[in-house]
Amino acid sequence: PSVFVYGGSIMPGEHPDGRKLDIVSVFEAVGAHAVGDIDDDELLSIERAACPTIGSCAGMFTANTMAAVGEAIGMSLPGSASAAAIDTRRSDIAFASGHAVMNLLRLGILPRQIMSRGAFENAIAVVMALGGSTNAVLHLMAMAFEADLELELEDFNRVAARVPHLADTKPHGKYHMVDIDR
C-alpha cells in the first residue's frame, strides 16, 4: 500500500514594486541584465526576492504537475497538491496520509488497484486542464508501465482534444500553484 505525500511548492516572492516573482523572474532578469535593460541592483533585488521560502518551484512545472497527478490518479489525498510547503496544513496532510495508508494496508489495497486505466485518463485530463509540464507524458507513461497498463502518446492527444486548458499558471500564465489552493 502507498500514499504519495507531496512537500508543497514555494511561495511566490514579491518585488519592492509589488510584482509577484518566481524562478522564471530570475531567468528573465538575467537575460534583461545581459542586454543592459536592468542594472546590477535590480537584478540582485529580483534574485533576493524571487524564492522566499522552501518548496518546489512555484509554477506548473514538473513537481506541481506530478503532485496534481498524484491526486487525480488516486495516490494522494484530495487537496494535498496545492498547499504550499510552508502551509500549516502540511502536517495535517501528512498525518491524514498516514491514516489513509494504514487503512489501505488493512483493506489490502495496492497501488495497481487504484491506478486503473480510468485513473490514468483522469490524470491526463488534469494535466491538460492545468497546462501541466510536458514531463508528465514521460512520467505517466513510466507509471503506466509499472502498473502493467498500456499508455500511448495518442492517449494524451485524445484526452487533450476534449479537455480545455483552464488554468492560467506559470510559466505560460500569471498564477502560481498556491493560487490554485485559494
Question: Can you name each region flagged by the protein language model?
Answer:
Residues P1-N122, V127:
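Active-site cavity-forming subdomains of large catalytic enzyme subunits
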Residues V5-P12, E71-H99, A136-R182:
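Terminal amphipathic helices with adjacent charged low-complexity linkers/tails
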Residues F61-T65, S133-H139:
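Catalytic-loop motifs flanking and including active-site residues across diverse enzymes
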Residues E121-G132, F145-A147:
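Catalytic cofactor-binding cores of redox enzymes
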